[in-house]
Design a protein with these regions (language model features):
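ATP/Mg2+ or Mg2+-diphosphate-binding catalytic cores
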Residues: 2-3, 10, 183, 303-344
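Activation segment
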Residues: 65, 128, 237, 245-247, ...
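ATP-binding pocket architecture of kinase catalytic cores
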Residues: 52-159
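A glycine-centered beta->alpha junction motif in the catalytic cores
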Residues: 65, 99, 117-133, 174-184, ...
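Conserved NTP-binding catalytic cores of kinases and kinase-like/nucleotidyltransferase enzymes
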Residues: 1-98, 234, 342-344
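A cross-family kinase active-site recognition segment
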Residues: 132-191, 216-218, 317-318
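Active-site acidic catalytic loop and adjacent metal/ATP-binding pocket
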Residues: 41-60, 93-95, 204-254
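Active-site activation/catalytic loop segments of kinase-like enzymes and analogous catalytic loops
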Residues: 250-281, 297-313
């Protein structure tokens, strides 16, 4: 079995992931592939559905080289196993076994494989459909699900993964874009920086208003709980990935599930909270962080696209990014966020 090494420092970190390389890596970690292979939608990592002898399939995730440390990934895996132990519906990574001289497996659950310069996790395949968020009973069920997730999340903490706050998501994004030579077109550069700086200042004020007396409680979160990351079956909701797990306020896992403006969201939030508070207490004061968190996500998303632009998958998927029209739209959206946050 050949094991070409991932170009860790290259803008093309997945260039070596040919179909044979993917199948070889899976077999190097103790599974027997039958040749079936399908690439799944993922930008940050590379994810494949791999068929196994016997007819089953697994999901193999190749983490972006240089993005995570072993410690950060293993905290993600431990959280998944903690949730699984508490019977919270989540797909935890499988235990692996090194079956090649160049392969090794690490972690308390032997769940992180190293093959040919790649970090790899393999999970069972679980299906489902998008949740029907216009159904109040679905929202109540999701509320109970998130309450259980956060109850488990509160029983430990991440020491190596990100803590969500205005510095880690907002200031870091502005700093990166400001220091990039070609991310911001000259004609809109200062307008965007002004809009982003003012929006971030308003987000900081909102976070500051939560403390020190009302310090925001930090728990382990899913971190990216939008409808596309949830799957629904007759048994209820589950999710299959904790790639963005972080420390932060519980409200971070709620607001992305609720589309529309504040008035449209209110009845949906009521149903979600009805389910949540049937199992756990929720700090309603932290709802004031929804618009600041939305602002931080906007800043972070722009910086994320800029950081990944050398990866050919990104220009193909986001051809509008980096244009003057894109940045002018961001200026308008950030200015709107500033007004909304000022109004409280």
């Amino acid at each position: 079995m050949s094991t070409p090494h991932a170009p860790t420092g290259s803008p093309l970190p997945f260039a070596d992931l040919t179909p044979d390389a993917v199948l070889n890596a899976v077999e190097a970690l103790g599974l027997v592939a039958d040749g079936r292979l399908m690439a799944l939608n993922s930008y940050e990592n590379r994810v494949f559905m791999v068929g196994l002898d016997g007819g089953d399939s697994v999901i193999a995730k190749f983490y972006r080289p240089g993005r995570w440390t072993d410690e950060q990934i293993l905290e993600e895996h431990q959280f998944a196993h903690d949730l699984q132990a508490d019977e919270v519906p989540v797909v935890a990574p499988l235990a692996l076994s090194a079956q090649h001289p160049e392969a090794r497996v690490v972690g308390a659950h032997q769940s992180l494989g190293h093959v040919a310069g790649h970090r790899i996790a393999i999970s069972p395949r679980r299906g489902g459909r998008a949740p029907e968020l216009d159904d109040p009973e679905v929202l109540r069920w999701l509320g109970r699900f998130l309450a259980r997730l956060h109850q488990t999340g509160a029983q430990g903490r991440f020491e190596h993964r990100l803590t969500l706050n205005p510095d880690t998501l907002g200031q870091s994004a502005i700093d990166h874009l400001q220091n990039s030579d070609d991310a911001l077109p000259l004609g809109v550069r200062q307008r965007w920086l002004d809009a982003a700086t003012e929006a971030l200042a308003q987000a900081r004020e909102a976070f500051d208003r939560q403390g020190p007396v009302r310090q925001v409680r930090q728990v382990r979160l899913h971190g990216d709980m939008h409808p596309g990351n949830l799957l629904w079956t007759p048994e209820g909701p589950h999710f299959v990935d904790l790639d963005d797990a972080c420390m932060g306020p519980a409200v971070q896992d709620l607001w992305m599930l609720l589309p529309g403006d504040r008035d449209e969201r209110r009845p949906m939030m009521d149903a979600l909270m009805d389910g949540y508070e049937s199992l756990a207490e929720f700090d309603w004061h932290t709802l004031a962080l929804i618009e600041p968190l939305r602002t931080l996500r906007m800043l972070h998303h722009s910086a994320w696209l800029a950081r990944r632009w050398a990866d050919p998958a990104f220009p193909a998927a986001f051809p509008w990014f980096g244009t003057e029209a894109y940045w002018l739209q961001q200026v308008e959206l950030l200015n709107q966020q500033t007004l909304v946050m000022r109004e409280g």
